[in-house]
């Protein structure tokens, strides 16, 4: 995800907290790998990764978000779906 895409997701202007947003973007691939098992090399192929990344950025950037429980449930559901996708990649490599 680019800084421009992240700013669009967060509804902020580029230049507003760019360093913070960039650090959150940098954390996404490793976080997704740890939580789902989906390797970063496969993350670009999965459309759900971009969706999950947007929700994660929103949760992390707006830590005091009033609707964080609904957001967390959505993130949990997407994480489970990507975990299944990661297993598919794992099984295809083993063949």
Task: Please name every model-derived segment.
Residues 1-95:
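Divalent metal-cofactor coordination and adjacent catalytic microenvironments
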């Amino acid at each position: 995800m680019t800084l421009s895409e992240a700013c669009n997701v967060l509804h902020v202007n580029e230049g507003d907290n760019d360093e913070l947003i960039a650090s959150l973007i940098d954390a996404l691939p490793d976080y997704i790998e740890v939580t789902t098992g989906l390797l970063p090399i496969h993350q670009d192929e999965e459309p759900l990764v971009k969706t999950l990344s947007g929700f994660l950025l929103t949760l992390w950037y707006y830590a005091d978000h009033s609707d964080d429980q609904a957001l967390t449930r959505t993130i949990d559901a997407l994480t489970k779906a990507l975990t299944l996708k990661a297993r598919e990649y794992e099984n295809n490599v083993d063949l």
